[in-house]
Structures are given as C-alpha cells and as structure tokens.
Amino acid sequence: GWFVFQLGRRITSSDGGVIALAYYLFVPLGVLVSRSIQPDALMVMLLVIAAYGLVKWSDERTWTWAVVAGLTAGLTVLVKGRPLPIVVAMLIGILVSSRKLRDTVRDPKVWLILGLTALLPAIYYVVVIGGGTAGYVRAYSTGLAALLLEPSFYVRWLNFFDNLLFLNLAFIGVAGIVLLRARARGLMLGLWIGYVLYGLALPYTIYTHDYYNLPAVPIVGLSLAPAAALLLAKVVRLNLPWQVFLVAVGISLIAYRSWLVRSGILGTDYYAEPAGWVNMGEDLPEQGTIIGLTHDYGARIAYYGWRNVAVWPTGQDYAFYELQGRTQGKFEEEFDARAAGYDYFLVTLFGELDNQPLLKQRLFDQYPIAAEGEGYLLFDLRQGSDT
C-alpha cells in the first residue's frame, strides 16, 4: 500500500495518492485475495514496486533504481508468468515517454533493466519448465484464440470486470490519464494497454476467475489519482461545512464497502473445514491410488489430509474442453481411460456428481462403497461388478 500511495503522489499529488491507496485497500477483490494463500497478492505488490522503481529511475537515472526496477519487474513475472504483457507494456510506456528513442537505446541502464526483467523468468519458464509453459500457453491462450472473434467474450469480460472492480471508475481513470505529465501518462497507458493484452491472451479465465483480474486493482487505483487530485483541489477551496460533508460521504462509502467485504468473509464459516479434511485423510486407505471428484482439484485433501487425489473433471472443465474444440467420446470409454490404474474413486462434490448422471450411475451401480464419512464417499474400483 505504501508504494501505491507514493506512486500516486509522485505522478499527481498527495491527494491523488490517498485516493489511489483508498481504492487499492478497500476494493472487495483486493481484500479477499489478500486473505488467500495464493501468490497473486505478492505478484501485484511486486508489480507496484516495479512501477514505482521505474518512475524513480526515470526521474533520477541512477544505477540503484535501475536495479530495483529491473529486479522487481522480473520477480513479478517469476512469481506469476501471466502478467508478462503488463510488465512489458509498462516498460515500453515509461521508456518511450522518458527520452528520445535514440538516447533510450544507447543508455546502458535501460539494457540493465531489460536484462534483469528477462533473466529469472527466462531461466524458470523456458529452461526449467519449458514444456509446462508451452502446454499452458496452448491450453489457455492460443487454444482459445477463437473466443476473441465472439462479441460475447468482450461483454462477459466487461461485465465481470464491473462486478469486481467497478467499470465506471475504470472509465473515469482512463479518461483522467490525459491530465498526467508525459512520463506518468506513458506509464499508465502502458499499464492499461498491458492489462488489455493480458486479458486478450487469456480469453477464458479473464472472465471466469476473479483473481486473474487482480493486476487491474492498482492500475484502476492509480488511474483515479489525477481526476481525484483535480477534484480535491477544488474541495479545499470550499467552506468548512461542505468539506466536512464531503469527507463524511467519502468515509461512509469506504465504511459501506468495508462492511460488505467483512460480511462476505464472516458469512461463510470455514472453521470446521481443516478438521474435516484431516479426518478424511486419516480415514482414506493408506494403500492404493485414488481418483476423485473433489474440491479445488484435490488441493484441500492434499493440504489438510496429506493425500494425493487425481482429478476427475467437473462440469466447468467439460465446458472448457468444448471451448478448446476437444470432443468427448462415449462416457464408458472415457471412464475406463481416466480410471485405469486407480483403486478408489473419492466424491466430495456431491452437487457435481448429480450434474454428471452417467458417472453417478456407473459408480453406484457397479462399485461398492469402501468408506463413507462426513462429506465424502469412497468407491472401490477394484471390486466393480464389471470386473
């Protein structure tokens, strides 16, 4: 948060920095993800520090800030490879708007920034897990490029964005970029162009997974800074009663949004979750392999119960396969192929099981229940009536 305020203050004023920080701290998506064990919050923090480092380097042209900007930009992509378009566009925006192109190309500090940005991500994503990187790009990006030709994709994206981050504020922020100085304008245009390219590169998850939009939180917040600074400059010239009134309105808005987020967090009680998964892990057979229709692609039982469960696709997964153009064969053939080599079938998602009637019928008709407990059923695939 400190870097958001400092960056907002640096590109506008302290008033703009306060508004950018308020949005960053209180927008519901940011609050919810900050309480998650996912690395996305760290990725966003590094992105903000990288942007701040670039602005400081652009102003001071020191080797220290070149190293800070390059390292944090590289670490942003290392933590999560997805925001690569945002980082690249941000770099281009600030570099192009800072000096003449010829001077920029001849500056060794520029090449240091670019080298540090590329080094660690290239080692990890190309050398260490190159095959996995290529598979991810095929599955979630190039394999879904046809979605970009459908108008419904853009409608879904904008609607999803609006529900998460308030589209009207984003439009105000984009319009407010024209109020910035050249270098700050280049930075913010780079961030916005990068976010758009980021969404186009991930044309399915950008409107189905809320945390994929997390990089937009600081972008929207910082974009609001110039318009907010202009507005607050007018407010300070008002009479005291009007100033008090507007401050009260702002505090009320923040309090209202904070209460909604708090209610959402407290409305779902996960207190008993860990114990349930621990008990399940203890109850499952120690010998034998397990495939299952289970929560979070097996992450909960793996984390709390220390049991690895191979994943049976959910309805959303099958819909994703259709978008990729992958045709599904006959159910019996699919079941035999997926379940081959596994000894048990675990079910914890009973709603999903009801939505897959052929799977439900196969399990209950042909396999005995090996274990049953609170929140789960375990079928013995070794003793099926067809074997």
Where are these regions (language model features)?
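Short acidic/glycine- and proline-prone juxtamembrane loop motifs at membrane-interface regions
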Residues: 35-42
